[in-house]
């Protein structure tokens, strides 16, 4: 029986879909299953998910990936979880059911509330949490649920509510309600966590009026939290599997890219675009609009990172496809962009839900600048792809300033990293080498690596490094003066979108 091959199963719960992946010891993806779930937009700027639908979708993907691969649950050494961060779920402890839809990280309903704090409070929050007061983070979302759902405050007072980000919700469900935990990376994105003590902070809880009794216990990213409930995989199947990692999706990609040394950078192009640089055990405070975040943790050690968050990246391509209908699918954008020699000085600023790092303007809105009678569909498509690279470059530039050293190399992943036009433009505009690994599932691999390390599937980080293979490397093809001219136009365009909503009301 000892010769039976073992695997790691990863649950990758994203913003638009729930995925399940099976990985072997060599870092190969054996099977993948993906199911999309519904996006709800009840009002302008509001974004919600049905947490029950997320659970059902994730469970279905988990069962289907095992069926598809022919791998028995007994061959799974451990389950790792990675998730969309900040999205907040509050549920009733007695029924196990959410009292309101999950409020998604993109949601802007608390933007006005976030404007009400004085300078000293803003500085206190940044000093303690590493973050800024912004609708993006979970804390203000939880406050909104407690303040607006009938009887929620009373239920919280009676100890009948539980709050978690999606990882906590999934672990709670996977264990049949036995385990209520989170990890350092997800806890830190709530605005309620102190990066110096690595625990919930009473002053922050008081500021946002959130009772401590609704919060989960904080654990490391790599340890056994509990076991799946009997019957999870099929009726009558009593197999219970260790749940051995929990890590926010962007931190998971950093670990999956094996950016384990100080100064190493990864850029993930998903719905948004997220750039992290490892700062080791040092907490680096940003003076250039970035966030200080937990990178990952083990039982005895916490590592930190600087992060820049771009709200709209791949979502801008979805907008071209679904709203403007000028492309049939995302893959076509590379072809369209290559049909014109330049962007004809057209700039697209896709700040549909405001601007993230380094600007942090919740009231900016999207715009297209530089249109004339000669502008064609190809120019707009090209400018939209370029906008993704410009936004990432704004963050990479800020990172170089905070780290007091220019970023010369970064590793890329996410769906849009397959777009060669975008990757070459990114290399050009950032004047950096861009490296893409063969296995683009770096987010899932980070959680898999963490789970595998927790149960001894992999002995150490050196073993993990053997699994990393490079697909391509790109170097800049434009000179610095050419790039400076392009960036100047981008800066002008971005600045003209600032405070748009405020100024027209």
Curated annotation (Swiss-Prot):
Belongs to the FGGY kinase family. Pathway: Polyol metabolism; glycerol degradation via glycerol kinase pathway; sn-glycerol 3-phosphate from glycerol: step 1/1. GO terms for biological process: glycerol catabolic process; glycerol metabolic process; glycerol-3-phosphate metabolic process. ADP binds at residues 15, 19, 271, 314, 415, 419. It comes from Mycoplasma capricolum subsp. capricolum (strain California kid / ATCC 27343 / NCTC 10154). Sn-glycerol 3-phosphate binds at residues 15, 85-86, 136, 249. Its EC number is 2.7.1.30. One of its GO terms (molecular function) is ATP binding. Inhibited by fructose 1,6-bisphosphate (FBP). InterPro entries: ATPase_NBD, Carb_kinase_FGGY, Carb_kinase_FGGY_CS, FGGY_C, FGGY_N, Glycerol_kin. One of its GO terms (cellular component) is cytosol. PROSITE patterns: FGGY_KINASES_1, FGGY_KINASES_2. ATP binds at residues 15-17, 271, 314, 318, 415. Glycerol binds at residues 85-86, 136, 249-250. This is Glycerol kinase. SUPFAM superfamilies: Actin-like ATPase domain. It holds the Pfam family FGGY_C. Transmembrane segments: none annotated. Key enzyme in the regulation of glycerol uptake and metabolism. Catalyzes the phosphorylation of glycerol to yield sn-glycerol 3-phosphate. Gene3D superfamilies: 3.30.420.40. NCBIfam families: glycerol_kin (TIGR01311), PRK00047.1 (NF000756). Signal peptide: none annotated. Keywords: ATP-binding, Glycerol metabolism, Kinase, Nucleotide-binding, Transferase. CDD domains: FGGY_EcGK_like. It catalyses: glycerol + ATP = sn-glycerol 3-phosphate + ADP + H(+).
């Amino acid at each position: 029986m000892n010769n039976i091959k073992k695997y790691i199963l990863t649950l990758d719960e994203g913003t638009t879909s729930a995925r399940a992946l099976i990985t072997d010891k060599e870092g190969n993806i054996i099977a993948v299953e993906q199911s999309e779930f519904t996006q709800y937009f009840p009002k302008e700027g509001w974004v919600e998910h049905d947490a029950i639908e997320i659970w059902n979708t994730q469970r279905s993907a988990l069962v289907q990936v095992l069926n598809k691969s022919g791998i028995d649950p007994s061959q799974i050494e451990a389950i790792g979880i990675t998730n969309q961060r900040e999205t907040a779920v509050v549920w009733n402890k007695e029924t196990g059911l959410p009292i309101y839809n999950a409020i998604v990280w993109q949601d802007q309903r608390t933007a006005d509330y976030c404007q009400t704090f004085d300078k000293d409070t803003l500085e206190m929050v940044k000093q303690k949490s590493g973050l800024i007061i912004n609708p993006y983070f979970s804390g203000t979302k939880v406050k909104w649920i407690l303040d607006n759902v009938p009887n929620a405050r009373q239920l919280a007072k009676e100890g009948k509510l539980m709050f978690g980000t999606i990882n906590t919700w999934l672990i709670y469900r996977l264990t049949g309600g036995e385990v209520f935990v989170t990890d350092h990376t997800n806890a830190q994105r709530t605005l309620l966590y102190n990066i110096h003590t690595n625990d919930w902070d009473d002053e922050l809880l008081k500021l946002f009026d959130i009772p401590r009794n609704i919060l989960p216990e904080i654990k490391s990213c790599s340890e056994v939290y509990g076991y799946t409930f009997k019957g999870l995989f099929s009726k009558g199947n009593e197999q219970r599997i260790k749940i051995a990692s929990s890590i926010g999706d962007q931190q998971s990609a950093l670990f999956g890219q094996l950016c384990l040394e100080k100064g190493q950078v990864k850029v993930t192009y998903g719905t948004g675009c997220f750039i992290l640089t490892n700062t080791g055990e040092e907490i680096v405070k940003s003076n250039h609009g970035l966030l200080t975040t937990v990178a990952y943790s083990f039982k005895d050690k916490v590592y930190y990172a600087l992060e820049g968050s771009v709200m709209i990246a791949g979502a801008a391509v979805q907008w071209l496809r679904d709203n403007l209908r000028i492309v049939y699918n995302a893959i076509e954008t590379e072809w369209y962009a290559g049909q014109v020699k330049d962007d004809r000085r057209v700039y697209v600023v896709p700040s549909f839900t405001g601007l993230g790092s380094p600007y942090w303007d919740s009231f900016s809105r999207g715009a297209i600048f530089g249109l004339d009678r000669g502008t064609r569909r190809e120019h707009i498509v090209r400018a939209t792809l370029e906008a993704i690279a410009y936004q990432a470059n704004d963050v990479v530039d800020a990172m170089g300033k905070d780290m007091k050293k220019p970023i010369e190399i970064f590793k890329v992943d996410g769906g849009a990293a397959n777009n060669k036009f975008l990757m070459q433009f990114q290399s050009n505009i950032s004047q950096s080498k861009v490296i893409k690994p063969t296995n683009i599932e770096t987010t899932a691999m980070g959680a898999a690596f963490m789970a595998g390390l927790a149960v001894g599937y992999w002995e150490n980080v050196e073993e993990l490094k053997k699994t990393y293979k490079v697909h391509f490397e790109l170097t800049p093809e434009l000179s610095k003066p050419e790039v400076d001219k392009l960036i100047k136009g981008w800066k002008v365009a971005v600045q003209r979108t600032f405070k748009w909503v405020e100024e027209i009301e």
